[in-house]
């Protein structure tokens, strides 16, 4: 958090959508919204006054175990990072190309998993939602991480794992594999390389007003394909 503090700015807007949370300060950052019926009764600290704060103050929410607050915190961190790296690259293309005949673990449900399954030697998908677990399809509960990740050649971890505090542990389990952290929640900071990531694949929000409006109106997948000219993929390698 402190490494990005030099880019602190007044908060212009905060949106908590059903899929994504956005914070707009100097730049616009995103974080995955993990909401449940239980969080409906747990009020976000400072609600109604978040735009009177700075992005660094909101970034400290990332430490919260109230996961809606944590999403606001991660989005605030991302709003203080100007993404570096190659633009316009889709990390899933890299994963499919490099995953041929490899043992792969994917943490989180990503698009194009059937393509990845076709080229890989073995593919395990770790899923937090118990309703989506299907062992016959290789979709396992997240608790299988200890068993599957250390056996993998390639590991792809959703950047949303930083919101629920599992990212550091997942990177530790992945120390013998080539590891990607990807998705809009991913902080594009080389600090993550110190924790074991080999590639970061996040986004740069080019048009904050449009993206903030879309995520607050139920926007799900945010990508250059369905938010043309408003968001861009960025990839950075160790």
Annotate each language-model stretch with its function.
Residues 123, 165-184:
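A short, gly/pro- and small-residue-rich
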Residues 110, 129, 185:
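Residues in the short beta-alpha loop(s) of Rossmann-like NAD(P)-binding domains
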Residues 90-95, 138-150:
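Short acidic low-complexity segments
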Residues 180-238:
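C-terminal functional extensions of proteins
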Residues 120-135:
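NAD(P)-binding Rossmann-fold cofactor-contacting core
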Residues 99, 116-119, 149-150, 171-176:
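Short, conserved loop/helix-junction motifs that constitute active-site signature segments
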Residues 105, 154-158, 180:
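Structural motif
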Residues 1-118, 215, 232-238:
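Electropositive, gly/pro-rich neighborhoods at or near active sites that engage anionic ligands
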């Amino acid at each position: 958090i402190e490494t990005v503090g030099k880019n602190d700015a007044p908060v212009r807007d905060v949106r908590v959508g059903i899929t994504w949370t956005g914070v707009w300060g100097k730049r616009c950052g995103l974080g995955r919204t993990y909401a449940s019926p239980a969080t409906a009764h747990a009020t976000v600290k400072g609600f109604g006054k978040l735009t009177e704060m700075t992005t660094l103050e909101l970034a400290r929410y990332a430490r919260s175990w109230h996961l809606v607050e944590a999403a606001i915190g991660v989005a605030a961190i991302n709003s203080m990072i100007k993404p570096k790296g190659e633009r316009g690259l889709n990390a899933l293309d890299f994963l499919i190309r490099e995953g041929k005949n490899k043992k792969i673990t994917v943490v989180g449900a990503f698009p194009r998993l059937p393509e990845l399954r076709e080229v890989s030697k073995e593919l395990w998908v770790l899923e937090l939602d118990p309703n989506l677990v299907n062992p016959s399809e290789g979709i396992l509960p997240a608790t299988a991480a200890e068993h599957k990740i250390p056996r993998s050649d390639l590991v792809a971890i959703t950047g949303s794992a930083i919101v629920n505090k599992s990212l550091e542990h997942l990177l530790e389990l992945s120390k013998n594999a080539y590891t990607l952290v990807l998705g809009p929640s991913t902080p594009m900071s080389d600090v993550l390389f110190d924790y074991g990531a080999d590639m970061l694949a996040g986004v740069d929000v080019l048009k904050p007003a449009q993206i903030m409006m879309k995520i607050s109106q139920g926007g799900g997948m945010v990508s250059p394909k369905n938010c043309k000219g408003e968001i861009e993929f960025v990839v950075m390698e160790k």
